[in-house]
Amino acid sequence: MTDETPKTEVVQDPVSGAVVPAHPVGEETALRLTLTTPLYRGATIAMFLSGLGFSAAAPQIASFLVNDLGASLTVAGLYYLTALTAPVAGYLVGARSDRTGNRLGLFRLCALAGFLGWAGIAFSTQLWMPFVISAVVLGFAGAATSQLFAALHDQLAQTPRASNDGVVAIVRMALTAGWVIGPVAGAFLAAQTSARVMLFATALCTLAQILPLGALKDVPTSVPATAHGATAPAAPGVRVMAPLLVFTALYICVYAGESIKYAYLPIYMNDQLHLAPALSGAIIGIQPLVELVLMPVAVVVARRTGMMKPMIVAAGFGVAANLCFALTGTAAGLFAGQILMGGVWGVFAALGIIAAQRLLPVAVATASAIFLSSTALSSALGGLTGGLGAAAFGLPLVFLIPAGFAAIAVIGLILMARTKAARDL
């Protein structure tokens, strides 16, 4: 007798790795789950505030150093190197979080550090003060985001669902939405008041991250407590962390082009192509809009194909985008490049943090911190090679450098996809 019982289609939950039904009966959608779960809802609002505050200050800080504190353009440019302490601070916070399981407590401390840091910069009277504050205090403040994603992972892993990856994508989309609005809001506030007021507003946004989470506590995990004489788990060794470190290095190659693009694409559009300001603004602004649209699409595709294939394609988009910047010489070509870059970040923004946590499941806070803080290294790499490339090749051929970095990422991701660690993604 033939068994005609219908087979249930299954997928692998990218957060927990569990195999779950693709379309379970009564399954809550990711949006509904986010809205009805206090942690997910609070994390979404917190990440929007984080992106809003930081992106408001980032484009204005150099002008503040020059106009308010008397820095030269060269010295002001060196400020961005202070972010190089972020990976070290992020690793220390992440390792502490994995030993204790205290995700939300550390998140609140990091957010408080961010408030104190940005407020300190806003009230700085000497040029050295923002540099020291950024290197020491804001390095730890940046770990707030990684702790929140680690807390999300812990709760999502408690109940494997096909919609879990969608929850992470929604929270990540909120961070991106903050980055879309922040630069405009920051420029407007600075113009209407002053750079110091805008920087203090950034401090308030950073502190306000704490409010949506209220008094929520961490979800109990298998991490043993260190109190009462219990032995803390050993930090993962380099060999265990190797897949994560390789993936992060390839991500740095993809991301390095962003600092080059934002430094030289506006100059290229204004000084050589002589594009109208409105057209230049539209070219810059199209990328985050495409990114927001494609993030949920990337999640759906990854459920069917695994994460590596979309990320390989996205890195390929990075190659094509930078070739458009370097070789087309037209507004249409730059639009195409920015749309392709939206595809790059639509995929990596949605899937990158999940992949990083899956590559080091024994220490998800450490994994989150290493991955998210790596943008500081990529910005430094892009700034250094972009400066040398602009001097050697000029504009627009400097964009061949990030095209080369993205090509390295494509090759590396293809090779990594063949490893056991990546096949499980």
Task: Locate predicted features.
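Helix-loop boundary and gating motifs at the non-cytosolic
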Residues: 26-84, 259-272
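Structural signature of the two symmetry-related core transmembrane helices
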Residues: 105-119, 200-203, 309-324, 403
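C-terminal transmembrane helical hairpin of 12-TM major facilitator-type secondary transporters
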Residues: 294, 308-352
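Cytoplasmic helix-loop-helix junction between adjacent transmembrane helices
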Residues: 136-173
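Hydrophobic core of transmembrane alpha-helices in multi-pass small-molecule transporters
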Residues: 48, 128-145, 252, 333-347
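A late C-terminal transmembrane helix in Major Facilitator Superfamily
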Residues: 362-393
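Helix-to-loop junctions at the C-terminal end of transmembrane segments
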Residues: 89-102, 190, 294-307, 390
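Central cavity-lining transmembrane alpha-helices of secondary-active solute carriers
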Residues: 77-95, 285-297
